[in-house]
Amino acid sequence: MKSNGFKITCVVIVAVLLLAGVGTSICYSLKSYKAINEYVKEMHEKEEPEETQENDVTIAGSYKIRSTEAISDAYKSGDTSALDDKQKETLDMASKILDEIITDGMSDYEKEIAVYDWMCKNLANDSNLLVVIPAGSGDTDNPYGVLKYHNAVCVGYATTFRLFMQMMDIECMVIHNTECYHSWDLVKIDGDWYHTDIYSDVGRGQYAYFNMTDAMRSSQESWDTSYFPAATSMKRNKAMENIIECAGLSDIPGAIGQSIMDGNLSFVMKFSCEVNEEFARRAIAVIDIFSNAIDTISFPNGGGMWMNGYRWLPNDDGGFVLWVSVYKYGEEEDNSDALTEEERDEITSAIYEMINTIQEKLGGNGEGEGGIYDNPDGSDDGEFEDDNVDGVEDSDDSEGEDDSEGEE
Amino acid sequence: MKKRLIALVLVTLMVLPLAACGKKEEVKDVDFYELRTKMLEAGENLPDMQTASSADDNAAELLGYVSDMDYEKVSNFFVSYSSEGLTDEIVVIAVKNEDDAKEAKESLEKHLTHRKNLFANYSPVEGAKLENAILRVVGRYVYLIIADDRNAIEKAFNEMVK
């Protein structure tokens, strides 16, 4: 009897445990099924990316690219009946600006420069873009808010520039990057398309992001090249107006230094020597070193600069040019009165000595002949010569090698 | 013998679920205003910071800027962020049910990825700080700290919560 009771108890306990196990299994199975279903759905959504389009795209999760063709059409036709009040006010503001900056007889290229200059001078980047919870300044992504409050995010610059271009019958598109975090313009001048990114130029470089080719732009961004038209011409690129003639590798450091000091942050170097594959690689290697050095430059107020892009590009004359773009952020302070004239002369002299040393290492003659940098006072007292070549070994081999490769 | 066996089975049944669930981290209920104050004080190099929290009228909308999780699952939160658009940021979310902490963490991971993409495009130098962000779950709390003084700020959190 006692034994039977014990058996029954055991059976009941085992039955309860089995039931609990089965119940738990069913619960987990249902949960897993739900999770798998959600995962499959998510993967399915990822596999079908949205088709690229110019308008009605949201950038950085907040700012929408909207068409402004109704406004430009009204400007060209003179019929504003289809516009709402906000669009009418936008048209009024934009028309006044064009009246102010565009003159009769201007080419499309000159009109483009006039609009670019006005926008760079009169608009400012809206810092709200990077604030976690932005304050409600509003309308920074469309021409109405941009022209009224002079404050813009990238979408605001791009749509406002496009509005101006379309008002003047110049073809223009707003383009966005693959990740939908940035937008800029594609503009057609004299039959060729170019990339222009005013947001990136405001308060920074002069024409660094103006009328770039696909090859230049791809240093910083990627986009759907199957949807947006190709930009391959160098004709109306601003860097091509800043051509520095170089004899060989040894001219590169001076060319870069001089361009930065002249405020030309986008420029090209054209070489009189033969540009073969080996030379092209060596030139890029020299700029790699410069790129690392420039990264270390910092202004007292926290600003600085870096090499934004550099690459060999096919020139319209059938040859190749070496394009360099430098990105400058923050403002340089005017410290011209911080040194005495004597200190300034000594430091300047030392810097020229150092650059001449670099030129020597790259195969130049190091005496200023044909070099970009000549010591302005003509002195060669050697005062800083040894102090400034620390860590740079004198190597006959390397000099010899560079002589054969870098110079004519 | 029978009683002992039954007692043993019952005890095993009681202990099994505990073992299956794993050990849950013991945390204290804290005053969020005080928690925020202590954490911000610990960040000596933080820039000017603004704060949004569950005390705000539009709290659900404000949390939406950093987390897409259902606000019904949140018991408390605060977001302190640089008003100048720098990367510095402290987010603490307390969920009602500890099981939802994972969801809160995932939502902050998405927010961190968004911030990394944003700064990669617009301010790469400042964005480097995001690579060292701290994102952790402690009990029913989830926190994200992006700051030079992140270790000191995390220490202040642990001193209050643990």
Model-derived features: where do they sit?
Chain B
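Bacterial N-terminal signal peptides that target proteins for export
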Residues: M1-V9
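C-terminal motif of bacterial Sec signal peptides marking the signal peptidase cleavage site
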Residues: P17-A20
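Bacterial signal peptide processing site
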Residues: G22-K24
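Extracytoplasmic/secreted envelope proteins and their assembly/folding machinery
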Residues: F32-R36, A101, K105-E109, E154, ...
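Short, compositionally biased low-complexity segments enriched in polar/charged residues
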Residues: T51-T87, D99, E103, L130-E131
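Second-shell loop/turn segments in exported
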Residues: E89-N97, Y141-I146
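A short, solvent-exposed beta-edge/loop patch
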Residues: V125-K162
